[in-house]
Amino acid sequence: MIALLLNSGRGTRMGAETKEHPKCMCRLDDQDTIISWQVKLLRRVGVKEAVVTTGPFADMLREHLESLNAGITFHYVPNPDYMNTNYIVSMDNARALLEADDVISLHGDLVLAPEVMDMLAAAPVSSVAVDASLPLPEKDFKARLTGGRVSAIGVNVFGEECVASQPAYRFLRKDFCRWMEEIRRFVERGERTCYAENAFNAAWEEIPLYPLDVGGRLCAEIDNPEDQARVCAQFLRTVRSKA
């Protein structure tokens, strides 16, 4: 199993902090950044190789990851056009490194409880984190469920059949390769600023993806300072206090 860590975004909604480092290097507490915590969880489930997409501050991120001495081999894939494209292009750039194994894919601003990573790694089918205990968020991903499978993921996906979702994925190799094929089609025809999930939505019937309900456990993105305060407080209360 290989990890895909998406870190090519600018993180402008974080304000002044991301003018000095990538968003994934925002601190959760005095022990961990977002990405150092992700790396610890990946090692926890036996991942030994990770593809890291980069945008601004690529050298700083590389230095940070290598300083962790995590026992993971990192492959860095830059997106030179990160200012004008979305991570659909970053994923397309990395496709050659992601064809041979099952994939755990995380957005670089995602904070997870250890149990959520354990659930992802153990999932026998391609899965995405959802939380049916939460109200549907306005600004974050929702997943539409059809016949027990995920049929659409997006910010503007609403309805009674939808649940709150986060971009934490476990993909079987064949399913991930099919998604990447559709991503390639999108990029080739110039759809370079949309979410990669748009490509999944276009081919969902051929990509069996199932909801993995995290049941209220921490699984949340940090998009802005308000998110950071809330998620860090939850991290300290529900994760760090148990360590």
Predicted regions mapped to residue ranges:
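Conserved alpha/beta core of the MobA/IspD/sugar-nucleotide pyrophosphorylase nucleotidyltransferase superfamily
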Residues: 1-3, 164-243
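Short catalytic helix/loop segments, enriched in acidic residues and glycine
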Residues: 20-36
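N-terminal nucleotide-binding beta1-loop-alpha1 segment
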Residues: 1-19
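Phosphate- and divalent-cation-binding pockets in alpha/beta enzyme and binding domains
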Residues: 13, 60-63, 115, 221, ...
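Conserved beta-loop-beta/alpha segment of the NTase-like Rossmann-fold superfamily
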Residues: 69-141
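A structural signal for short hydrophobic beta-strand segments in well-ordered beta-sheet cores
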Residues: 25, 143-145, 211
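Conserved core of the sugar-phosphate nucleotidyltransferase
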Residues: 113-190
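Conserved N-terminal catalytic core of the sugar/cofactor nucleotidyltransferase
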Residues: 2-5, 32-101
